[in-house]
UniProtKB/Swiss-Prot annotation:
It comes from the Bacteria. This is Chaperone protein dnaK2. PROSITE patterns: HSP70_1, HSP70_2, HSP70_3. Belongs to the heat shock protein 70 family. One of its GO terms (molecular function) is unfolded protein binding. Residues 603-623 have a biased composition (Gly residues). Keywords: ATP-binding, Chaperone, Nucleotide-binding, Phosphoprotein, Stress response. Residues 602-637 are annotated as: Disordered.
């Protein structure tokens, strides 16, 4: 099998890594950076941009620039009411699912499709580094992602043309990277605060065994929320001074968001940050500017509620692991948002331990995913990973109650069977409502979907016996099987109605992505060809001017003719002619260059007998491979 890459598909930034020579290596993207912004944009020319280049143009193109899409993946519209208000692009309902609106293409995208473009770029950049096509990956997800979100992430990989060998929890991946060389047993708590999600996992690591004892988290808490409190502060301050709410203007909102992120980062190392946004808006009186100083103390005051929310999952994870903070050996900090001083202080206060900041918080998750990829590919030996399901799974029973079949923090993979019966006499079918969550009432938990089992022989209520089996694989993804013991009927049930895509939708998106990838490649090749042609036209003109009379008239005329024709092909965007004329002009320039060198060589040969000692010394003695010393000669007349 080929190389298996590990991908951290983040809310804000993503990262890709691979095992090389038994060690994980983070792969830089085509732009030379080790992390890639999880941003996809479409320009007015309908060109697709991914990564840094997409992020840079967001202010001028807020409607068609998609970021923080991970917060929508695998979710229903009614689950993302707050998140949808915080982005500059349109978030729409498609059935019960979420779609993002792209006005310039006049179409909607599923979050999986947008994430797939980020995954595709990471895989392509990794392929260029490795010198082979990347087709297999391990992709990370927040530990607290539910079944729908995990399945949606796997679908995104499929749309990107990747075989997703494993979905692995982000804190577990970080623990793999941290504990790979640990021989002695350690109990560690991984505190993972990323751009859009927050996870806490407690693990026992040592001698190649990584056992997750518990996990907790909040999928509605991350760096984006810290940015938002700054955005709101800036907007409210400006509104009180000028009477204008900048959040109603998409371009202004995008500028505020970028300024907030920059200020948040600065405040991790400085005690105050200057925020200057000239020409943020305009009124009949003229342009308006935003100029404000944000102190670290004010930021911590604004974010106090968010910081306090980080405490609850830590306490819950320790409680579920049946450990006290004094029994922990290390607190491993993961995710860019853990650089916030108030977050570090909270961890220290809650656990009475200094956080371990030896790992790179932006890269460690991808590194762990690469290690897991190495395990699956057989490159890494003697690693045993025991992960858990983050949320309880069950079914709705009589009275709207959730009956749990698999409780949270159960080691996966796992399988559990329960027997249920009918609620009324003569019932020939049952509808089973599959749920995920911790609340007592079905309506308060996440609905993963419903299915019907038909063909039950009529009988008094309570007599039929229906076996329902929940099976969670190593990815944490659920499948359900039902069997009527009376009739012997057994069938695997595909859960429908969940906030994920159907197989046919995924297949269609795979084909669309492949077609678009081909079209994008062709478009890039044309742009590269045009750039080469324009460069050569400029070089030809410059070269002819510099050489002047040294070029024979016939040769110069041929170069000028080819250069003019190539310029005409560029203007007409005739790419076939461009390719041919590019090669022809290059050939003419090679001929001119060779002719000029021959002339100079002949002139030099004729001058040698004249007794120029310096020239004789430089060109005379010895091997052609001898060092050549640069020198200036003055011609004596």
């Amino acid at each position: 099998m080929g190389k298996v890459v590990g991908i951290d598909l983040g809310t804000t930034n993503s990262c890709v890594s691979v095992m090389e020579g038994g060690k994980p290596t983070v792969i830089a993207n085509a732009e030379g950076f080790r992390t890639t912004p999880s941003v996809v944009a479409y320009t007015k020319n309908q060109d697709q941009l991914v990564g840094q280049i997409a992020k840079r143009q967001a202010v001028m193109n807020p409607d068609n620039t998609f970021y923080s899409v991970k917060r929508f993946i695998g979710r229903r519209v009614d689950e993302v009411n707050e998140e949808s208000k915080e982005v500059s692009y349109g978030v729409e309902k498609a059935g019960s699912n979420v779609k993002v609106k792209c006005p310039v293409l006049d179409k909607q995208f599923a979050p999986e499709e947008v994430s797939a473009q980020v995954l595709r770029k990471l895989a392509e950049d990794a392929g260029k580094y490795l010198g082979e096509t990347v087709t297999q990956a391990v992709i990370t997800v927040p530990a607290y992602f539910n079944d729908s979100q995990r399945q949606a992430t796997k679908d995104a990989g499929k749309i990107a043309g990747l075989e997703v060998l494993r979905i692995i929890n982000e804190p577990t991946a970080a623990a793999l990277a941290y504990g790979l060389d640990k021989k002695s047993n350690e109990r560690i708590l991984v505190f993972d605060l990323g751009g859009g999600t927050f996870d806490v996992s407690v693990l026992e690591v040592g001698d190649g065994v990584f056992e997750v004892l518990s996990t907790s988290g909040d999928t509605h808490l991350g760096g984006d929320d810290f940015d938002k409190v700054i955005v709101d502060h800036l907007a409210e301050t400006f509104k009180s001074n000028e009477g204008i709410d900048l959040r109603q203007d998409k371009q202004a909102l995008q500028r505020l968001t970028e300024a907030a992120e920059k200020a948040k980062i600065e405040l991790s190392s400085a005690t105050q940050s200057e925020i200057n946004l000239p020409f943020i808006t305009a009124t009949p009186e003229g342009p308006k500017h935003l100029d404000l100083t944000l102190t670290r103390a004010k930021f911590e005051e604004l974010a106090a509620n968010l910081i306090d929310r980080c405490r609850i999952p830590v306490e819950q994870a320790l409680k579920d692991a049946k450990l006290s903070s004094s029994e922990l050996d290390e607190i491993v900090m993961v995710g860019g948002s853990t650089r916030i001083p108030a977050v570090l202080e909270l961890v220290k206060r809650t656990t009475s331990k200094d956080p371990n900041q030896t790992v790179n918080p932006d890269e460690v998750v991808a590194v762990g995913a690469a290690i897991q990829g190495g395990v699956l590919a057989g490159e890494v030996k003697d690693i045993l990973l025991l992960d858990v399901t983050p949320l309880s799974l069950g079914v709705e029973t009589l009275g709207g109650v959730m009956t749990k079949m698999i409780t949270r923090n159960t080691t996966v993979p796992t399988k559990k069977t329960e027997t249920y019966s009918t609620a009324v006499d003569g019932q020939t079918n049952v509808e089973i409502h599959v749920l995920q969550g911790e609340r007592e009432m079905a309506s308060d938990n996440k609905s993963l979907g419903t299915f019907r089992l038909d063909g039950i022989p009529p009988a008094p209520r309570g007599v039929p016996q229906i076996e329902v089996t929940f099976d969670i694989d190593a990815n944490g993804i659920l499948s359900v099987t039902a069997k009527d013991k009376g009739s012997g009927k057994e069938q695997s049930i595909s859960i429908t109605g969940a906030s994920t895509l159907s197989d046919s939708e995924v297949d269609k998106m795979v084909k669309d992505a492949e077609a678009n990838a081909s079209a994008d490649k062709e478009k890039r090749e044309k742009i590269d060809l045009k750039n080469q042609a324009e460069t050569l036209v400029y070089q030809a003109e410059k070269q002819m001017g510099e050489l002047g009379d040294k070029v024979e008239a016939d040769a110069k005329a041929k170069v000028d003719e080819k250069r003019t024709k190539l310029q005409e092909a560029i203007n007409a965007e005739d790419y076939d002619a461009m390719k041919t004329l590019l090669e022809e002009l290059q050939q003419e320039l090679y001929t001119v260059g060779a002719s000029v060198y021959q002339q100079e060589g002949a002139a030099a040969g004729g001058a040698a007998p004249g007794g120029d000692a310096g020239a004789s010394a430089a060109s005379g003695g010895g091997d052609a491979s001898d060092d050549v010393i640069d020198a200036e000669f003055t011609e004596t007349k």
